[in-house]
Regions:
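Glycine-rich, charged/polar anion/phosphate-binding loops
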Residues: 1, 38, 42-47, 70, ...
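ATP-dependent carboxylate/acyl-activation modules
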Residues: 1-58
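A short pocket-lining beta-strand/turn micro-motif at the edge of beta-sheets
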Residues: 2-4, 84, 112
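Non-catalytic, soluble scaffold/interaction modules
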Residues: 56-58, 65, 70, 77-80, ...
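Short amphipathic beta-strand starts and helix->beta connectors
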Residues: 94-103
């Protein structure tokens, strides 16, 4: 991905200055897509003076699903504690370890070799921590065998078409750039608080894997590159904060969807979830989940992970989607909560009438209509 990392000659012994320079230029394609001017001068000015003192360490990734959002967030957090200039390199592509999105989109898979390049007062400590993280599978439990899936019985309920509240986004702003930037920062802060609440909710229910998902979302949203890209759009387009943020996160979502790794590809819905939550705060749109009094099957094109965590499994018996992915965090959360999940049903889903009784067969990924 041109927007993620430049092709560099690090593996063949190139100067570290060249490695860093090329990696910093990896953002040029994204800047052009967003209509921003070239940042060549800016990159040259911000490039640290790397030399032969830089150290590196390569590890082989043993996480079954590679470095997806959760282990990547652990890596970002750990390396952020060291006073050193660092790059991560895989197959000649480099990204900064400050950005969970760049790491995730680097598509580091099982058995891939990942190298950390570091220079600075705590470079050695960073390399040691990197090696320890790899040995610990970046905080994930190594599965020696596939988990035994519990049989999921068919679930039934009345059909309810669900869609999140629509946020109206205006492009033209009547405020100053500084005022729009402050609006965006506040909305991001409110969304980060939302994510902390969701993490605590999952932890209180003993759902540690789900808590880790929303902790990863917190790290994903707190990526300084996202705010920087939106701030530049505000400067050059004189647009609203919601318009700038929508452009940046939609582009990121599309990058995830274009990956050839199905597991990482499914993470686009997480980005869409974060965008939606931030837009709700920016536009001050009121959003409340519907309440149900009888067994219900939710029908939708797709559904956000944060929405599912807030559902009551005692009433919402199943979720049936026209799109979606069985590898998404939404699917994982539904399964953990005991909510039936079938997806990729296509247009036939929309032939169902509201309040019609449905039965979902999770095992066969099919639904049946009463009568």
């Amino acid at each position: 991905e041109g927007t993620l990392a430049a092709t560099v000659s690090a593996a063949s012994g190139a100067e570290i200055d060249k490695v860093i320079f090329d990696a910093m230029h990896a953002l040029e394609a994204k800047r052009e897509q967003l209509g921003l001017p070239s940042s060549n001068t800016e990159i040259s000015d911000t490039c640290p003076p790397y030399d032969e003192e830089a150290r590196s360490l390569a590890v082989v990734i043993k996480n079954r699903n590679g470095l997806h959002v959760r282990p990547a967030s652990r890596l970002v957090y750990t390396l952020s504690t060291f006073n050193a200039d660092m790059l991560l390199e895989k197959n000649g592509k480099c990204v900064t370890p400050e950005s969970i999105n760049q790491i995730a989109l680097l598509q580091v898979r099982y058995n891939d070799t990942l190298r950390l390049i570091a220079k600075g007062p705590e470079a050695e400590e960073a390399l040691i921590a990197f090696r320890q993280l790899a040995e610990d599978n970046f905080g994930e439990t190594e599965e020696v065998a596939p988990p035994i899936l519990r049989p999921v019985p068919p679930v039934s309920g009345k059909a309810f078409y669900y869609q999140p509240v629509l946020c109206t986004v205006q492009a033209k702003s009547t405020l100053t750039v500084d005022e729009e930037q402050e609006r965006l920062r506040q909305a991001i802060d409110f969304t980060l608080l939302d994510l902390m609440t969701l993490t605590a909710k999952a932890e209180a229910s003993g759902l540690d894997d789900i808590a880790a998902i929303f902790s990863g979302h917190h790290t994903l949203l707190d990526d300084p590159e996202l705010l920087a890209a939106a701030s530049e759009l505000l400067q050059h387009e004189h647009c609203t904060a919601e318009y700038a943020w929508q452009q940046v996160l939609k582009e990121l979502s599309q990058q995830y969807q274009q990956l050839d790794d199905e597991y990482l590809q499914a993470r686009y819905i997480d980005v869409d979830d974060l965008l939606h939550r931030t837009l709700v705060h920016l536009t001050q749109t009121k959003e409340e989940l519907p309440q149900f009094n009888s067994p219900t099957i939710l029908l939708a094109e797709n559904i956000y992970p944060s929405t599912i965590l807030q559902l009551d499994p005692a009433v919402v018996k199943g979720i049936c989607l026209s799109a979606g992915s069985p590898l998404s965090h939404s699917a994982l959360i539904a399964r953990e909560l005991g909510i039936g999940w079938i997806c990729q049903q296509g247009e036939k889903l929309y032939a169902i009438q509201p309040e019609e009784t449905l039965t979902l067969d999770v095992k066969t990924q099919r639904f049946s209509r009463q009568g």
